[in-house]
A protein has these predicted regions:
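Short hydrophobic alpha-helical runs that function as membrane-insertion/retention elements
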Residues: 3-6
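A post-motif C-terminal structural segment
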Residues: 10-211
């Protein structure tokens, strides 16, 4: 079975990492990245790596994750157009944001999206197309709309709405594949957690233990 792990946030964030990493802290991003390579899955996608040079380790002289990824046989594609150019000739691939992106922690919110920004729909389509090159093996693909939760933390209803719609569009891509292969496709849509307490209003919540 071929395996793909994808998200709208960084490839080493908590939810994608839960499928391949074994670290004591979710913030050990460099080590999580090493686990990503060791897992040897076929396809990864997200905004980028959060700590590709191991900056958190004092005096570290660690090898860059991009170099290690290349040594492990992965092709790095920067954006969907670059993916389209490289996918056919690649055995294993990591899809990241275009090099022009200014924030490596996540792709832009759907409500703020500009022309050329990578979308969750593109990530989903890329994952399905890449993993289904050899259907005889079957595949598992995890797709996370990771910024729904972030927008809920900010109590930003408009942004939440657009992020959920973005996820809905990604599900439509998966459903298109299901319609072509109805007897062998299972789509599961779920939530690993939610912030809770989102209300109509303005601004994020605060924690006041003395109230």
């Amino acid at each position: 079975c071929r395996v793909g792990i994808s998200t709208s946030v960084s490839v080493d964030h908590a939810t994608p990492a839960a499928f391949y990493a074994h670290q004591g802290q979710r913030s050990s991003y460099y080590n999580v990245g090493l686990d990503l390579i060791d897992a040897n899955f076929d396809f990864y996608a997200g905004s980028d790596f959060l700590d590709p040079t191991n900056k958190k380790a004092a005096g570290s002289n660690s090898e860059r994750l991009y170099t290690l990824v290349d040594k492990a046989g992965y092709t790095i594609a920067r954006g969907y157009k670059d993916y389209q150019k490289k996918a056919k000739k690649s055995d294993k691939l990591i899809l990241l944001q275009p090099a022009t992106a200014t924030d490596n922690s996540a792709i832009p919110y759907a409500i703020d999206r500009k022309k050329g920004d990578m979308t969750l729909t593109e990530i989903t389509r890329a994952g399905i197309n890449f993993l289904s090159k050899d259907l005889s093996k079957g595949f598992f693909l995890m797709v996370e709309g990771g910024k729904i939760d972030w927008a809920c933390h900010s109590n930003d209803a408009a942004t939440v709405f657009h992020e959920v719609m973005d996820m809905d569009n990604a599900i439509k891509v998966a459903y298109e594949f299901y319609e072509q292969h109805p007897d062998e496709t299972l789509i599961v849509v779920t939530a690993d957690h939610e912030t809770g307490g989102i209300v109509l209003g303005k601004g994020p919540y605060t924690l006041n233990l003395q109230a």
